[in-house]
Amino acid sequence: MTTTQIKNRGFTLVELLIVIVIIAILTVVSLVAYNGLQNQAKTSTAKSTADSVAKKAELYNTEKGHYPEGLTIFTSNTDDSTTPPSDNKKNSWYMSGESVKSATLTDGSVPADGPLAIEYVKCPGSSTSPTGAQIYYYDFSSNKKVARVVGTGC
């Protein structure tokens, strides 16, 4: 009679190393994909913020007949006379200072305020009556600022 000995064998060192390398590759791929999704989400938020500012600028133009001089008019809730309205009657163009931040954007330099950072540049016109504006937001995927134009003259 022959008996076969059954030996309990574990994994070899090579097999364990192969599994570790596969796990490392999957981790790197998932991190890169996650960062890409994060940048897309930030860009989407920045574009939405710029669209909100553009709509508020259009409202301001409808009510006042010209575009605002700068972004601070939206967040200070004042009109051209710098008199704030009563608490129960806010200007239609008002935006919370927490929802938008004024910034000077440059390509390749991520803004400190993230996707809430907006650069508002009035178009040429008379000094008291701008005919439009360029509203810039930061594209986190391409690391560039992107312009959205409202009105004319830019």
Spans of features found by a protein language model:
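N-terminal leader/signal peptides at the extreme start of proteins
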Residues: 1-11
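N-terminal signal-anchor/signal peptide hydrophobic helix marking the start
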Residues: 11-21
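C-terminal juxtamembrane segment of a hydrophobic transmembrane alpha-helix
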Residues: 23-41
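Membrane-proximal amphipathic alpha-helices
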Residues: 38-50
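Alpha-helix exit/C-cap motif
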Residues: 55-73
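Acidic, glycine-rich loop-and-strand cores that form catalytic or ligand-binding grooves
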Residues: 70-113
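Short amphipathic beta-strand and strand-loop transition segments with alternating hydrophobic
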Residues: 110-127
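Short, surface-exposed interaction loops/tails
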Residues: 122-154
